[in-house]
């Protein structure tokens, strides 16, 4: 799984996710499923915001090539990907400027067009189950929830999918491709099933001769690493390097 992640995700995303996990004592070489999940969530958040701008009339526009006009403003503020202190600073600034209700938990994005925070979810399970879990945790009608699955399904608050169909299709296609590539490498079952993941982890550690002295456990809690990615990448260019193109999985 680790090799798959390094081959199939943008190197910047891999580096951010790896550093985030290590800062919380999580080893990407051991908790490889979590490593893959963090990278996937990051990529979806970036893809969600990619190419979407607001013009001088306040209208949402899509620009996919070249540098956007100076009069255009990014439609989405990316909160996911920043360290917690900076993320809360951004949230507080948004709330002070827009008078939006401050969320109890760090959201992933802020939508300047709809004036609302957005929580992005990527699930290996049924979308409605994951949606309800998110909604129960957030407990706020002010934060918009949008869930994607690896099977092409999606679910959003009040069936408001925010993005145009083509933009959402781009995300769904990427997730489906990730699933297919995992399956072709025999990784999908362990990625979906905690029991299979634990069995695979034991097998991998044994094959590496690293079982001695190591606890054989797989954490299923939401990783705090998802919220502590290094803010140094979030400069005024708004992760321009990520907007160029995402690496495609190499063929077997």
UniProtKB/Swiss-Prot annotation:
Keyword Kinase recorded: no
Alphabetically ordered keywords of this record: Decay of host mRNAs by virus, Eukaryotic host gene expression shutoff by virus, Host cytoplasm, Host gene expression shutoff by virus, Host mRNA suppression by virus, Host nucleus, Host-virus interaction
Active site: 80, 108
Lineage: superkingdom: Viruses
Subcellular location: Host cytoplasm; Host nucleus
Coiled-coil ranges (or none): none
Important for efficient shutoff activity and nuclear localization, annotated site positions: 195, 198-199
Pfam family, one: Flu_PA
A biological process from GO: viral RNA genome replication
Molecular function per GO: RNA binding
Residues of the site described as Important for efficient shutoff activity: 202-203, 206
Similarity section: Belongs to the influenza viruses PA-X family.
Record remark on domains: The probable endonuclease active site in the N-terminus and the basic amino acid cluster in the C-terminus are important for the shutoff activity. The C-terminus acts as a nuclear localization signal. The C-terminus is recruited to host protein complexes involved in nuclear Pol II RNA processing.
Function: Plays a major role in the shutoff of the host protein expression by cleaving mRNAs probably via an endonuclease activity. This host shutoff allows the virus to escape from the host antiviral response. Hijacks host RNA splicing machinery to selectively target host RNAs containing introns for destruction. This may explain the preferential degradation of RNAs that have undergone co- or post-transcriptional processing.
Name this protein carries in UniProt: Protein PA-X
Lineage per the UniProt record: Viruses, Riboviria, Orthornavirae, Negarnaviricota, Polyploviricotina
Encoding gene (name): PA
């Amino acid at each position: 799984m680790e090799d798959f992640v390094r081959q199939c995700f943008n190197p910047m995303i891999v580096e951010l996710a790896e550093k985030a996990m290590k800062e919380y004592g999580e080893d990407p070489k051991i908790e490889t499923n979590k490593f893959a999940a963090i990278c996937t969530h990051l990529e979806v958040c970036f893809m969600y915001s990619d190419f979407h701008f607001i013009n001088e009339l306040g209208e949402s526009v899509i620009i996919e090539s070249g540098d956007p006009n100076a009069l255009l403003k990014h439609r989405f503020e990316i909160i996911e990907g920043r360290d917690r202190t900076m993320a809360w600073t951004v949230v507080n600034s948004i709330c002070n400027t827009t008078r939006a209700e401050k969320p109890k938990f760090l959201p992933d994005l802020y939508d300047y067009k709809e004036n609302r925070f957005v929580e992005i979810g990527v699930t290996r399970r049924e979308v409605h189950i994951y949606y309800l879990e998110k909604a129960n945790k957030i407990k706020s009608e002010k934060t918009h929830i949008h869930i994607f699955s690896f099977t092409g399904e999606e679910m959003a608050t009040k069936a408001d999918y925010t993005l145009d169909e083509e933009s959402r299709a781009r995300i769904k296609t990427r997730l489906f491709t990730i699933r297919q590539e995992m399956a072709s490498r025999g990784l999908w079952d362990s990625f979906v099933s905690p029991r299979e993941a634990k069995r695979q982890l034991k097998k991998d550690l044994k094959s590496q001769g690293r079982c001695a002295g190591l606890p054989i456990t797989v954490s299923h809690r939401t990783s705090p690493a998802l919220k502590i990615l290094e803010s140094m990448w979030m400069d005024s260019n708004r992760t321009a390097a990520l907007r160029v193109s995402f690496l495609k999985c190499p063929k077997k």
